[in-house]
Amino acid sequence: MWNGKPDSIKTKSLGRDINVYFMFDFPFKTNKKLSVGIGAGIGSASVFFDRGSVDIAGNANRLVFNNLDTLQHYKKYKLATAYVEAPVELRYVQNPERSDRSFKFAIGAKVGALIDVHTRAKELRDKNGNSLNNSTEKIKQKKYFNTNRLSLTARVGWGNFSLYGQYQVTGLLKDGFGAVIRPYTFGLTLSGL
């Protein structure tokens, strides 16, 4: 989801995020319930648009979001981003000897470098929703997007499952190229934390 998104940008309710990280846990010597986790991995996100498109390959001074309510449009249209990231967490586990059966909590931050931005469109339709062709179009271009990001994270759970939240502190777009959009995510995590 996007915080700061103008009302003129019509996104569908939920996007899809997949994050995979390999992390190492370093328990405190003075208190085994606390530890620091550091690692590296990939974070990706997809935002879906309702009768809209994003002109990431355009030549305009700002990123253009097109409203296609009364025009030809694609049945499915998404904007996807991917980052290589380095997360750092401060972790708490209620019972360090049985971490797979105890309460856990973590707060942290991630720094990331943008490795991919693309749009993908499937099945062109007329303004009434009738299928015109079953084509797929994919466009890659990074010029409007910040190449680095900083995100704050939090997790709380039991055993290997937890609820997860992330808020991107830096804007999605470069300064001056559009609205200050800050993505945020909520979801489920499978982890050995």
Report residues per predicted region.
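Transmembrane beta-barrel domains of outer membrane proteins
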Residues: 23-27, 77, 89-93, 153-157, ...
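Surface-exposed strand-loop-strand hairpins of Gram-negative outer-membrane beta-barrel proteins
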Residues: 1-21, 173-175
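Short loop/turn motifs that connect adjacent beta-strands in outer-membrane beta-barrel proteins
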Residues: 27-34, 95-103, 118
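Transmembrane beta-strands of outer-membrane beta-barrel pores
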Residues: 1-3, 40-48, 92-94, 109-117, ...
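Predominantly the C-terminal beta-signal and adjacent terminal strand-loop region
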Residues: 136-193
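Transmembrane beta-strands of outer-membrane beta-barrel proteins
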Residues: 34-40, 84-86, 103-111, 152-154, ...
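Extracellular/periplasm-exposed beta-strand and loop segments of Gram-negative cell-envelope proteins
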Residues: 5-13, 47-58, 62-81, 114-126, ...
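Residues that define the transmembrane beta-barrel architecture of outer-membrane proteins
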Residues: 12-18, 80-84, 101, 146-150, ...
